[in-house]
């Protein structure tokens, strides 16, 4: 019989299970530290049951914060939903301490309702729904000061207690880096009997300081055996709306994402320009993917490659 886990338990599937200071004195320490005695987290079965009608799961990752990962998640979702009106898309915002999808999707102030089948995600369009901890806060200015285990518990709730229904694709907007949240969501989503049950896209900017961390993110995916759909280079250049001249705001001193992808043997899905109109629309929660511009032209090719990777 196992005792309840301590407050800061790293989790039974963590590589640190039974080894960190929080494990000292826990009656389960010997079980967790022995790989032959570890049990699978019971939450994994709950997640599998809740997501049985979700065809594909796509992690949107970034090694470095500030590269526009959440904005790219929104743009991809909006463009995919417009391009594939007969498909259903969901977005799960698991950036627990910095949830931005409610603003980007124009859903600030919306409420999450509970039914017999679980939490109902917020409807954004006819074929797009969204779930974020931002909907559960009293104010957009409320700070979330949680340790890893509590964040992991929230992620498990989002995956197992939200009524996602039938989705063709669930996009997960993750925090930057490779933290507890990433390990938690991967452990819940990975299905050993279906190795391609979850995929990843990695967002970067051209400069080397961002690419350094993207290499770590790629290695994280390879270690966790998460297939990488490809890399998106965001803010790759700025084209003046008046004269049409293109400028490199973030110069690619080492060849940018293209050179890094060739080096790491991962696909480059495409590049998105630095566009003030996109920033303005995202701040207002507006969808401008129907307007033809350099960003939507790039999104067309990127989204086509994404959908092709699932076929």
UniProtKB/Swiss-Prot annotation:
GO cellular component: a single term: cytosol
Family: Belongs to the Mrp/NBP35 ATP-binding proteins family. NUBP1/NBP35 subfamily.
Domain of life: Eukaryota
Protein name: Cytosolic Fe-S cluster assembly factor Nubp1 homolog
UniProt: [4Fe-4S] cluster 1 binding residues: 9, 23, 26, 32
Functional summary from the UniProt entry: Component of the cytosolic iron-sulfur (Fe/S) protein assembly (CIA) machinery. Required for maturation of extramitochondrial Fe-S proteins. The Nubp1-Nubp2 heterotetramer forms a Fe-S scaffold complex, mediating the de novo assembly of an Fe-S cluster and its transfer to target apoproteins.
List of residues binding ATP: 63-70
